[in-house]
């Protein structure tokens, strides 16, 4: 990360969620990264939240993401919705070639191509990752 100006990166705590159908970020989070139309927003996709209500997909924020111990940024597209915190969908991560291992004290995501392990911490009954994001000059995820 030292080759990239620190001011361009923003730190986030992302909850690793095996029940999330998409990787999402709150509307108010990372406002400096523009929202772009996504396949889901074009289709009028809505998400059902814990209280049974539905919220619309508003598009996506295309980001470069660094994680603890990583040496190269990864591309990720966060879907934007009126959620309370950033969520990383385990299903979407698996679709991108990551294996998720969770245990009593934490775990990791393992990239099937590079074998890189991204650490996951356990906070109470939640699993979280510390990440740094900035706007991606590219398209969506790899």
Regions found by a protein language model. Give the residues of each.
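Basic, gly/Ser/Thr/Pro-rich low-complexity segments located predominantly at protein N termini
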Residues: 24-25, 57, 64, 94
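Short solvent-exposed loop/turn micro-motifs enriched in small/polar/acidic residues
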Residues: 7-9, 40, 56-58, 71, ...
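Aspartic protease core domain of the pepsin/retropepsin superfamily
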Residues: 63-142
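Short, intrinsically disordered/low-complexity patches at protein termini
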Residues: 39, 48-49, 112, 142
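Aspartyl protease active-site motif detector
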Residues: 2-47, 77-89
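C-terminal reverse transcriptase regions that engage the nucleic-acid substrate
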Residues: 44-59
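Intrinsically disordered, low-complexity regions of eukaryotic proteins
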Residues: 24, 48-50, 113, 137
